[in-house]
Amino acid sequence: MIVSAQPRPTGHPGYSETLPCLEESAEVARKLVRTALAAWHLHELADTGTLLVSELVANAVKHTNSRLIRVVISRPSERNVRIGVVDKSRTMPEITKSNGEELLLGGRGLVLMDAVTERWGTDLYRWGKQVWGELRCEEAV
């Protein structure tokens, strides 16, 4: 696996890694998120960031037929951290209304993401999509 760190217009490097589309990749994705947040001195976002990337990886594994996914962590602004997962599916994620029992059995990934992020969205590409969530930094670094 190759991890890349690319400079961005905000002056903070972005981090990304291509991983197999498997449940086991969530552990590597969490380590990448912790590494990026530590580099930016944003340790307070580590728990939420790792929870977010775990849900994004789980959704890609469950809802796509992709062989590979790409985990992307960036700073679109001084105040935000964006964590995303890119896959080859063009199916857009939706928050579905369901009863509490259904949520206990699964299907809470997007509900959880909606609760812990400042905002989230999907960037659709010709060949797939990126689902991402943004976390708000308490203080600009």
Region annotations inferred by a language model:
Residues 21, 37, 41-44, 61, ...:
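Short coil/turn residues that cap or connect secondary-structure elements
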Residues 19, 37, 52, 56, ...:
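Generic leucine side-chain signal with a strong bias for well-ordered alpha-helical environments
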Residues 1-16, 61-141:
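Conserved beta-strand-loop-beta-strand hairpin that lines the nucleotide-binding pocket
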